[in-house]
Amino acid sequence: MEGIGQKKETDYIFDKTIKCDVCGKEFKTKQVRTGKARFIGTDDILKPLYEGIDTCKYDIIMCPHCGYAASLRLFGHHTEKQRQAVRDNVSSRFTAKEPETETYSYERAVKRCKMAMLTEMVTGGKISESAYLCLKLAWIYRGEIQEAKANGAAQERISMYEKYEKEYLEDAYRGFKQARETEYPPIAGMDENTITYLLTSIGIHCGKIDEARRYGYALLISRTASMKLKNKTRDVLETIKKN
């Protein structure tokens, strides 16, 4: 039973009407109210943490009519050639219909993020953008793990989510590593120091200890990295010693 004054997830979100650039139809998508949820910080893989809501479930916009999907930052910013690629390769076969619900479940968030990955694939998006979507999927699965544990789910189910989280972290690691070598910052909206930090932290999760150390030490001696990021780097490097 919820306490008096305790906010529900629905208090943090609203329905926004959007016109799809691919099919031209209008639809409603749930988005987080700006400034409504209190920002707590980020975890070791930079998942944003808010009080009362996991905003990662609402990071993807997907048209329910044609299947076009992308992150909040990229939705509606594809070229006509890319939009046509979505029509030819996604919309022509899209049949999934989302039910009306008050909030988005983690399962639904996963499906939406995978549709965004499909959009990236058919539009020839940058490697970094695909890597960022893999990271988002890892964030979503991390949230699903926490929810499953809180609800007393079977260990088998929790282990399955943990497996998926690691798989997408591995994909994100490979993508960001390649993007760092082939793209100019900003990379997926992030500066080089942030990417280097992610390679340090994600590398540790993926067992790439030597590579993670190299990235981490390079960040610690960087003249452009913030003290906050350096302290976060020290924290994740410390986990190597503990383990």
Question: PLM features: what roles do these ranges have?
Answer:
Residues E129, Y164, Y168-D171, Y184-E192, ...:
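Structural signature of alpha-solenoid helical repeat junctions
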Residues M1-D88:
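N-terminal cysteine/histidine-rich coordination modules
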Residues A188-S201, S226-N243:
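TPR/TPR-like alpha-solenoid helical repeat scaffolds
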Residues M1-E9, S92-A96, E100-A109, R223-N231:
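Short, intrinsically disordered terminal segments enriched in charged and Pro/Gly residues
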Residues A85-M117, G124-R157, M190-H205:
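Amphipathic alpha-helical repeat scaffolds of TPR domains
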Residues A116, T123, A172, A179-T182, ...:
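Alpha-helical solenoid scaffolds that mediate protein-protein interactions
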